[in-house]
Amino acid sequence: MAFPQRKRTPSFSSSVLDSVYRSIDESDGLQSDLKGSINENVSSSSSSPSPNKKDDKLTTLRRAIMDEEHWLYARSSTTTTNSSDSSSFSSSEAESYRTKRRLRKLAEQGKRSGDERQRTKRTVMDNDSRLFSKSDDDKKPKAVKIIEELKRSKQPVSPGARLTSFLNSIFQSNAKKVKLCSVGKTTDVKSSSSKSCFSRTRNKTDNNNNNCKKLERSIRFYPVRVTIDGDCRDYAQKHITRVRKPIPEFTAKKSVKEEIKTNDHHTEFTCITRNIGLKDFVRSNKYEGKEEEEDAWSHSSSDLFELDSYRIGMGRYLKELPVYETTDFKTNQAIARSLLL
């Protein structure tokens, strides 16, 4: 880690090191002094022997040196521990600060995510409540509403509506019907192909002769002349099977109802057509009477132009339009004489 630069002032560790170095230098000086004194003592001992005093001095000096060295070592260890403690403390503080910041960021993010979740839940609930509050009519499109209204509205009872309903029912019944191949009681069948003309379901044949009890209907033509008596029998393995299905009850009821409806429609249609025919007949008679009257008036007015006028000139008779007073025989004797001639 890069620590910030400190001011240029003597720190505690630098002062301790200076003192240690000084003490070492002083101990070196003391040792030199001790050596000199020892040498002097040796020389003096040679001159005047005093071994007890010399030993005491040496022991004291040695103790003093050992004490100083021990003190210096203890001080240096304390300084190193203090520096390591301070560095570890600073690093731990930095790490704790970073962890605190991370925890704060995580807490803020969690709060934000929780708020966003709550907002989304609220919006979803509001949308659901709006959808449930809306009625079914609001949800349906306009076209569906219009169709339902048209279905609900009652059709007017009129001959045109009856005609249209009758025609629609006829077309629907014709579409539902299936074209079948009718086979008479005695028929001659000639065909070069063995394909089936009509097959309602899958064709199945058994060895039994009671094929009429099956729920299948199939007509098959072969290139052999076959006469059918109405019974479902095999003729030299070239047969025509005709099976009738049992009509269920509900289909029978439906067919009866449909027949009743068709009969009602037919009667209504006949009545309507009769009324329409009578109206047309009356109208045609009226028009014919008017035309005859107009023809009569035209004949009476055209009689003037059909009169013959005779004029004699150059030995020939000419037919022209009548001139005033030329048709009177008394006034015009020439015309009368010519007519007599």
Curated annotation (Swiss-Prot):
Regions of compositional bias (Low complexity) in chain numbering: 76-92
Subcellular location: Cell membrane
Annotated InterPro entries: BG1-like (IPR039621)
Compositional bias segments (type: Basic and acidic residues): 52-61, 105-138
Keyword Nucleotide-binding tagged: no
Annotated keywords: Auxin signaling pathway, Cell membrane, Membrane, Transport
A single BP term in Gene Ontology: auxin-activated signaling pathway
Region (Disordered): 28-61, 76-138
Gene Ontology CC terms: plasma membrane
PANTHER family: PROTEIN BIG GRAIN 1-LIKE A-RELATED (PTHR33541), PROTEIN BIG GRAIN 1-LIKE B-RELATED (PTHR33541:SF13)
Family stated for the protein in its record: Belongs to the BIG GRAIN 1 (BG1) plant protein family.
Function (record text): Involved in auxin transport. Regulator of the auxin signaling pathway.
Name of protein: Protein BIG GRAIN 1-like C
